[in-house]
């Protein structure tokens, strides 16, 4: 039997794949640091519902429980093995299919992870990642918060604690943006999010086929609507820059380069 039907407002759902060592690590610290209470097969704390699941969240096509948004606690793997704390929105740009993004969640998590890195003197890179992988069919915003990048790091206690604290950080507000350009690990977009109030949800990197339709879909799949397009001009060729300009004009949305955002201290 599953948990009882939530009462009142829908919860923010924290999903933790039981076979994911990073998810287990983060869960352990959430339950140690905060007064979550058993709630059916889950744990509840106010508006948060922590749910261990058997199915890999990447493959979800429907919500396991009613929720206002989903945060997936996850591992991140890369051949570099570089210690990493990362955040991203899921989507499959190559197919033109994107999940619903909530930039406020992405920005809040990224800033909280950076603060945890500094306070704990952690060696981890904190970064926004480009939009990639599923799930893409859920009816609410989805955000991944991850520990990388190898088996040793997934179980690192300090990393699990840092993510647990970030998840419980009060939501911050900013200007909702779609990011374009740059590499998969987006140092310039990350810098902009840490130094300004431009909150990027979907990030479409330079290596995807950057069409006006794809940018428009990213704008459409931003909860509350995107207020601007934040462009890494150094990470775009002339054709891509032209596409961004034409699309922002057609949609009636401001376009800023990262240099402009940093200079204006938005």
Each language-model region and where it sits:
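N-terminal catalytic or cofactor-binding beta/alpha core of small enzyme domains
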Residues: 1-138, 150-151, 157-164, 168-189, ...
